[in-house]
């Protein structure tokens, strides 16, 4: 069955491509030369570690990892426990409060519980230099994450893609809308949230789609690992 395929099965070949090896080498060289790179090396591929290919139900595309200390840990929009909730995620919580009955905004921005339920929180670029947004945008990560999206498109069916902002929407242009459910809105950033992110109802619509397919909806209330045991 297609959904038994793992990331390792479908990405092993891609990870041997010269461009990908060059990307890893460039990042490793920068780290070795003393440049602070986020997220830490062990966290770069967490999106794939927490959400296996066969478990993907929803894809949320981010752009660049957070470039402040302690924020990025490999999941788009998410920050580690104890780190202030960034503005875009705060706006996501506001949309959830306004649309999901009983949702109360948590005091943290750690979204591992979403990832464990099948929400792939994928940044299109997987590393960044400290304090320098988009500093790794041309290293080859975009080619890799394009491949990831095309593999989900090819090997899975009925995945909900939440594409917020023009960058994500361009990135998602290859998705087959006959096989998958694509929802578009402005980015939740304070610069654009009022242009249609608020009121987009994407979290509700995603769950409705999953339920129609007989799948378990996402519990959008983020819980810290200790709370969920």
From Swiss-Prot:
Catalytic activities: Hydrolyzes single-stranded DNA or mismatched double-stranded DNA and polynucleotides, releasing free uracil
An annotated GO BP: base-excision repair, AP site formation via deaminated base removal
Signal peptide region: none
Subcellular location: Cytoplasm
Matches recorded under CDD domains: UDG-F1-like (cd10027)
Gene Ontology cellular component terms for the protein in this record: cytoplasm
Record's keyword annotation contains Hydrolase: yes
UniProt-listed InterPro entries: UDG_fam1 (IPR002043), Ura-DNA_Glyclase_AS (IPR018085), Uracil-DNA_glycosylase-like (IPR005122), Uracil-DNA_glycosylase-like_sf (IPR036895)
Molecular functions (GO terms): uracil DNA N-glycosylase activity
Protein function: Excises uracil residues from the DNA which can arise as a result of misincorporation of dUMP residues by DNA polymerase or due to deamination of cytosine.
Protein name in UniProt: Uracil-DNA glycosylase
Provenance organism: Escherichia coli (strain K12)
Source organism phylogeny: Bacteria, Pseudomonadati, Pseudomonadota, Gammaproteobacteria, Enterobacterales
